[in-house]
Amino acid sequence: MNLQFNQSLAKSYKSASQIIRVLSEDWVSREGYCPNCGNQPLSEFANNQPVADFYCQSCAEQYELKSKKAKLSYIINDGAYATMMARIHSDNNPNFFFLTYSPEFIVNNFLIIPKHFFTADMIIERPPLPATARRAGWVGCNINLKKVPELGKVFLVKNQQPMPNEQVTEQFQKTLFLRNQKSLSRGWTLDMMRCVDKLPTHFNLQDAYRFADYLQLRYPNNNHIKDKIRQQLQILRDKGLIEFLGNGRYRKL
């Protein structure tokens, strides 16, 4: 995988944002592949496509690309707040590619957040633009990646090191079961994933119960939080994300 942008494409543009859009989209079209099925290359949508930037001709997964000249941060600028919220609740929201690059126009990090990891509480509403702005009153948003469990951060390139394709597709496909869950059930599973992220590789049921107060705040109408924790651990076990060792002991895989 060649991590260098083709800077010759920038000669026809003056706007920094246009240059980065052209260079990053060109790089993804040349070097990117579908994290779901491994198909390469990805195809580009027409420029006026409102939902996504790329799609896979083999499995039809769709991807939107966000690029940034900086280290990978937890807060990512996005577009209109109302549009983003509508997409999260729709059936055709795309997966998100996040790309960071160096001052030398080399890809530092390239990762995907699968669409089934996006929840409303990840989206931060920004203040409306002031009356003096060209788009006065427009409300944008940021994406808070801190809310994404580690399993939902699938790196294709990490610290300028390409990841094996097989590893990428395996991690992506491990969590596809979330797409078949209803919103509330998926929320529980994502919350449990975030809790497990904070535990050591080997943990026990009592360790998981430490999150009971946090989960009670998240789900105040649920009066059986510990039962729910056990249920969610069983789901993660059945999906091959953790291993049950017996006697209330678990191991993260």
Regions found by a protein language model. Give the residues of each.
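Short Cys/His-rich Zn2+-coordinating modules
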Residues: A10-V22, P35-L42
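Short, positively charged loop/turn segments that connect secondary-structure elements
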Residues: D213-I229
